[in-house]
Amino acid sequence: MLPNEVFLSHSSQDQDFVARLVETLRRHGVPVWYSQTNILAAQQWHDEIGQALRRCDWFLLVLSPSAVESMWVKRELTYALQQNRFENRIVPLLHQSCDFDRLSWVLASFQFVDFQQSFDEGCRELLRLGGLGYQPGR
């Protein structure tokens, strides 16, 4: 069931997709921790990320070629995989085809939510996890 708060791990190069996803999730009542809106000027961003990872109870991972190359995405995922509270609460979101094994071979065992063909269908599937329902344009 979605969530008290979800952590959204992503590459900054996927900003357009991620901003659209965050807006959609928030419109559907899902509280999202997202670095672009949750880290304020003059804050220590690495400390803020760490605090959010410790606080959030779901981990959404946006997968793309740039995410696979991101040191921070890899660090965030490694942390999430080590936390019991994220068991069955790590959801890979396939934004673009990529070699996700480079992040972690464990990802092959997860059920992905595929956004490659349709953003709306991807959102519908993701929100179904929490029984929140999805209404395009909401």
Regions found by a protein language model. Give the residues of each.
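Short amphipathic alpha-helical segments
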Residues: 4-6, 108-111
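Conserved beta-strand scaffold positions in the cores of enzyme catalytic domains, especially
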Residues: 90-92, 112
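Glycine-rich, charge-decorated loop segments at or immediately adjacent to ligand/cofactor-binding or catalytic sites
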Residues: 98-109
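Output/docking surface of receiver
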Residues: 109-126
